[in-house]
Amino acid sequence: MKIAATFLAIHILALGLGMFGLISAVPNVAQFAGNPYALAFYSWAIVNTGTVDIWTGTLAMLAFGVASIGARRTLFFFLAATLISATAELTGTKTGWPFGGYEYTGFLGLKLAGRVPYTVPLSWFYMGFASFLLACKIVQTARVKNELLWSIVLGAWLLMAWDLVLDPAMASDKMTVMHFWVWKEHGPYFGMPLRNLAGSLGTGLVFIAAGRFAWMRPIDARRMAAWLPFGVYAANVIWAMALSLSVGLWPTALAAVALSLLPATFALRPARAGAPLPA
């Protein structure tokens, strides 16, 4: 667990550095012109900070998964999440289905097939895994019937709720210096097509279900150390909220509090004593 906590700390630091760069350094790059060291660091950070925070988030959740539910389950979920999300993204950037017409810029690292940054499936994994483990803890602690179904549905919802606040900001026209992707069509949700949200929810449902069914037996998440997946999830939602506020999208930031952060906090409730889950 110490390894996972270390990667979480680095992940949060990288997110903070990235946010500072986006809202302060990037719009004022001229201030570094007279300082070659600052300019060199800026040049490195603008290319690599996003990659660092995605990799550290991935490593934090991999380490947590191995420590909490075992290497086999963690590997199965990793493969399901990365392969299915990469397939969806490659299909989406070519055909416009299931997310709508869009293309990635060069700010998220090297691209698979020249279209999808290789870091994108990793972000699907670590946020999807965190969302699903939080959902398992919430559903099992509340002793909800049909635990398998509702943990998958809630996990996919928490993942999609992150998109509600992240995507409009990342592609906002007010991000005048750098965009992470560009929409080829206009939609009613702050410029995004609604099918992007449906595609995000559907992709999450598919890979979360695939990863979970590969486990065969359920996990008992009631006494899981939920603070770590919550830390990963909350850090990324708060980062997206800060970016949204920086470009004037306060409605999406408020939506993130109500639809993602508040529901996720229920995973921090202590578990009540009860019978073990069926094998």
Show which residues each predicted segment covers.
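Aromatic-rich, lipid-facing transmembrane alpha helices and their immediate juxtamembrane interface loops
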Residues: 1-279
